[in-house]
């Protein structure tokens, strides 16, 4: 199976299969991350979608289970462990809901702290 | 050299904190303490902490971090209390905000600065923040 084919879930021998690309999964993860208070994209104002999402979100499939790796920034003032746990829960939930693929783990890499006064856009 | 990370195992997967993230928390904690100033004229705390060797050094152990800080205290402030305040603030923020276990926080007071010089530094750094 070619890697670019994406993640395949077999619905059954007669119903055919569904293939979901890495970009789709990465985009879902990015969108989920954007909704977690205290989490910000490490660069720019929003989490990239489509191909760009692959730079921040790494997707791996092992034995039918998805493993996600995501790079994020944390907004200063939010407890890091709390917001990263919420992020993990949220991403797992969204990917499982939207793709029906089981998520084994969500690895989070915090690469930056954003201080509110430096946040682009300011009050939000 | 690759970015150093503190990796914590969590039920839903790893949470890795870049060293620069821990440094940012520690540097901001120091800024909250009254009577502490940068070591050299012309730069704010952030400038000094931008090069870790100079003012702030964090060592990553398996499951905890050790911190080493070099600071200057403004004359008139009780040096020991300021240093302890720095220790406490750094420990509190790294544990409470970053959520990491903190081992040692060693503070080295390297200089005392006359208040008038500190005032100049303060104005400079305020101007710098407005411009940036």
Label every PLM stretch briefly:
Chain A
Residues 92:
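Glycine-rich active-site/cofactor-binding loop and its immediate structural neighborhood
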């Amino acid at each position: 199976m070619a890697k670019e084919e994406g993640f395949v879930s077999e619905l059954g021998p007669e119903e055919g299969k569904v293939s979901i690309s890495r970009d789709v999964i990465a985009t879902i993860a990015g969108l989920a991350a954007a909704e977690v208070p205290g989490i910000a994209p490490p660069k720019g104002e929003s989490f990239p979608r489509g191909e760009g999402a692959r730079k921040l979100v790494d997707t791996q499939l092992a034995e039918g289970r998805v493993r996600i790796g995501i790079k994020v920034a944390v907004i200063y003032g939010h407890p890091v462990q709390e917001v990263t746990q919420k992020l993990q829960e949220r991403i797992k939930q969204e990917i499982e809901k939207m793709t029906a693929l089981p998520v084994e783990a969500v690895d989070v890499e915090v690469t930056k702290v954003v201080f509110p006064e430096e946040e682009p856009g300011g009050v939000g | 050299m690759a970015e150093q990370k503190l990796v914590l195992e969590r039920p839903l997967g790893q949470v890795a904190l870049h060293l620069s993230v821990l440094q940012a928390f520690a540097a901001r904690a120091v800024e909250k303490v009254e009577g502490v100033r940068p070591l050299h004229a012309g730069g704010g705390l952030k400038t000094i902490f931008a090069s870790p060797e100079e003012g702030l050094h964090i060592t990553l152990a398996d499951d905890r971090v050790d911190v080493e800080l070099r600071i200057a205290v403004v004359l008139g402030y009780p040096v020991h209390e300021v240093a302890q305040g720095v220790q406490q603030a750094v420990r509190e923020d790294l544990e409470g905000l970053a959520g990491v276990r903190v081992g040692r926080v060693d503070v080295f007071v390297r200089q005392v600065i006359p208040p008038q010089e500190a005032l100049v530094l303060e104005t400079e750094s305020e101007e710098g923040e407005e411009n940036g």
